[in-house]
Amino acid sequence: MKRNDPCWCGSQKKWKHCHYPTKPERPSDNLRQLYASRYDIIIKTPDQIEKIRKACQVTARILDALCKAAKEGVTTNELDQLSCNLHKQYNAIPAPLNYGQPPFPKTICTSLNEVICHGIPNDTPLQNGDIMNIDVSCIVDGFYGDCSRMVMIGEVPEIKKKVCEASLEALNAAIAILEPNLPLYEIGEVIENCAARYGFSVVDQFVGHGVGVRFHENPYVAHHRNSCKIPLAPGMTFTIEPMINVGKKEGFIDPTNHWEARTCDHQPSAQWEHTVLITDSGYEILTLLDN
């Protein structure tokens, strides 16, 4: 967005005469007040952004270590114990632990094969041919980071490889279009188009979300086609986490634990996730490892 373009807020003024920031990545108080009152969205201050960035880097490091440890024969409970140790090492708090109702019982989510999201670690060993999403959310000094990745165990069937590839491609394509003034619905458009090229479906029961000051904030970021016209603005932080199914988009919540979401047709599902920051000129992926 250029200085002489119309401002994203709809005032019909040029951006430079309206919400153009006086300093890089320092949105005006008027912008924060507008987004808080109109959309209940927290536009972060430079100090908050720096603390969220730190939390996101810790989250990414823990996720990276867990992905490297996920091998055939390892149980997801063993990964959860490693997660506990890593959180202590980084002086971080696992955000999922005891979250919600019923309280989530583990420090990470491990979603295998047909589990769409919110998989609960257990004592079943990982097997050759499994795919798994590991989702890590950390609290560091009171601020939150959130990211996830797919891992493939041993020799994985081609269709499972394809759905992992499609989800990552959809995430990267959605991130690539981010900039101030972009309406939120464009994210869902890009993801739907990407999934369609593979012949896969996009889960619409779960969404991305604002994150940083709280675990879950506005805006909710739909990965499917939608009509949300909220314009992105510098200082917004949120997750993009497309869940792509090989078969039908519908899922159901496991009635035995009230957390795990599974595909209704038991076909594989895949998800990748990053926390992103909207900047004055585009975006920053906060959960991208700095090394």
Swiss-Prot record:
Coiled-coil features, chain-numbered ranges: none
UniProt keywords, alphabetically: Aminopeptidase, Hydrolase, Metal-binding, Protease
Family annotation (PROSITE patterns): MAP_1
Residues annotated to bind substrate: 118, 216
GO annotation terms (biological process): proteolysis
Cofactor list: Co(2+); Zn(2+); Mn(2+); Fe(2+)
A GO MF label: metalloaminopeptidase activity
Cofactor remark: Binds 2 divalent metal cations per subunit. Has a high-affinity and a low affinity metal-binding site. The true nature of the physiological cofactor is under debate. The enzyme is active with cobalt, zinc, manganese or divalent iron ions. Most likely, methionine aminopeptidases function as mononuclear Fe(2+)-metalloproteases under physiological conditions, and the catalytically relevant metal-binding site has been assigned to the histidine-containing high-affinity site.
Residues given in the record as a divalent metal cation 2 binding sites: 146, 209, 241, 273
Annotated positions binding a divalent metal cation 1: 135, 146, 273
Gene3D superfamilies tied to this protein: 3.10.450.50, Creatinase/methionine aminopeptidase superfamily
GO cellular component: cytosol
Reactions catalysed: Release of N-terminal amino acids, preferentially methionine, from peptides and arylamides
SUPFAM superfamilies per UniProt: Creatinase/aminopeptidase (SSF55920), Sec-C motif (SSF103642)
Enzyme Commission number: 3.4.11.18
Assigned protein family: Belongs to the peptidase M24A family. Methionine aminopeptidase type 1 subfamily.
Function according to Swiss-Prot or TrEMBL: Removes the N-terminal methionine from nascent proteins. The N-terminal methionine is often cleaved when the second residue in the primary sequence is small and uncharged (Met-Ala-, Cys, Gly, Pro, Ser, Thr, or Val). Requires deformylation of the N(alpha)-formylated initiator methionine before it can be hydrolyzed.
Subunit structure: Monomer.
UniProt protein name: Methionine aminopeptidase
Species annotation: Chlamydia muridarum (strain MoPn / Nigg)
